[in-house]
């Protein structure tokens, strides 16, 4: 699993589980507010007066209204198994080398 997912998922899951109000800033500067209802590899479902499906590629920053504990409780140090999918084989998570194009 990619390192980004192993940080993202416990953080988002803690926000969802504890119903923490969040501000989500998009790459175009728009600020969305609400609670994370659910999420998967590509989207976050944000609920306020309405539910909005927000694509992760459009998100710049997720800011919780209060501190949350998002430590992984798996004693083996691995990732919890609450993910709803995996990265397709056709999409590598990291480039293999640092060669310039």
Curated annotation (Swiss-Prot):
Ranges that cross the membrane: none
CDD domains, alphabetized: Hfq (cd01716)
Biological process, per Gene Ontology: regulation of DNA-templated transcription; regulation of RNA stability; regulation of translation, ncRNA-mediated
Stretches assigned to the Sm domain: 9-68
GO cellular component, one term: cytosol
Alphabetized GO MF terms: RNA binding
SUPFAM superfamilies: Sm-like ribonucleoproteins (SSF50182)
InterPro entries: Hfq (IPR005001), LSM_dom_sf (IPR010920), Sm (IPR047575)
Domain of life: Bacteria
Location of the region described as Disordered in the Swiss-Prot/TrEMBL record: 63-101
Residue ranges with Low complexity bias: 70-86
Keywords in alphabetical order: RNA-binding, Stress response
Pfam families according to UniProt: Hfq (PF17209)
UniProt xrefs under NCBIfam families: Hfq, PRK00395.1
Function: RNA chaperone that binds small regulatory RNA (sRNAs) and mRNAs to facilitate mRNA translational regulation in response to envelope stress, environmental stress and changes in metabolite concentrations. Also binds with high specificity to tRNAs.
Quaternary assembly: Homohexamer.
Family recorded in the similarity comment: Belongs to the Hfq family.
Name of the protein described by the UniProt record: RNA-binding protein Hfq
UniProt organism field: Sodalis glossinidius (strain morsitans)
């Amino acid at each position: 699993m990619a390192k980004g997912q192993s940080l993202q998922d416990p953080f988002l899951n803690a926000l969802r589980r504890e119903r923490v109000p969040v501000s989500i800033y998009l790459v175009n500067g728009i600020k969305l507010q609400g609670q994370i209802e659910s999420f998967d590899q590509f989207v976050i479902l944000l609920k306020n007066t309405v539910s909005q499906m927000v694509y992760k590629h459009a998100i710049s920053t997720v800011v919780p209204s209060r501190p949350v504990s998002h430590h992984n409780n798996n004693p083996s140090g691995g990732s919890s198994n609450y993910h709803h999918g995996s990265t397709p084989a056709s999409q590598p998570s990291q480039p293999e080398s640092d060669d310039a194009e």
